[in-house]
Amino acid sequence: MVAVRWGRKGLRSQRRKYSRIAYKPPSSKVVSHVESVLNKRDVTGAEVKPFADGSRYSMKKVMLIATLTMAPGELVNYLIVKSNSPIANWSSSFSNPSLMVKESVQDTVTIVGGGKLESSGTAGKDVTKSFRKFVKLGSGISQTQHLYLIIYSSDAMKITLETRMYIDV
């Protein structure tokens, strides 16, 4: 089955269906890798974006993998949000430490997912923790919208963020 026909979906009637099968449009995977140092008791964020240029795409789902090196007993809260406009200042948009969306940006920000990560271990040794979050974005995020990972850390720590974006170009 080499013929590709996208555009037609659904039924004409219950007895008479479309004669040709409608296939899904092609999707591709884009992987990115970012390393950063988080400051103590600070709200920071990173934009999840497949391309730096203005090519046309629609993101359908994202897999976020974060690995953190932190001291025992520390806490990391994170939110995954989508926004119609770019977020310039993280601290003015999200509360500290609970990461609640402030009233000034409530109309433009939608929370997609979130969670927390706590470390345990013996004192004096750093602990490496990680989380993997798979986020389905429904109808998708176009190139005019923005997807962010917002992080609050209770202590200074190193983070490695890897993302795999499933996009339709």
Swiss-Prot record:
Subcellular location: Virion
Major location category of this protein: virion
Pfam families (UniProt xref): Nanovirus_coat (PF04660)
Keywords annotated in UniProt: Capsid protein, T=1 icosahedral capsid protein, Virion
Domain of life: Viruses
GO cellular component term of the entry, any: T=1 icosahedral viral capsid
Similarity comment: Belongs to the nanoviridae capsid protein family.
Name of the protein this chain belongs to: Capsid protein
Source organism of the structure: Subterranean clover stunt virus (strain F)
Lineage: Viruses, Monodnaviria, Shotokuvirae, Cressdnaviricota, Arfiviricetes
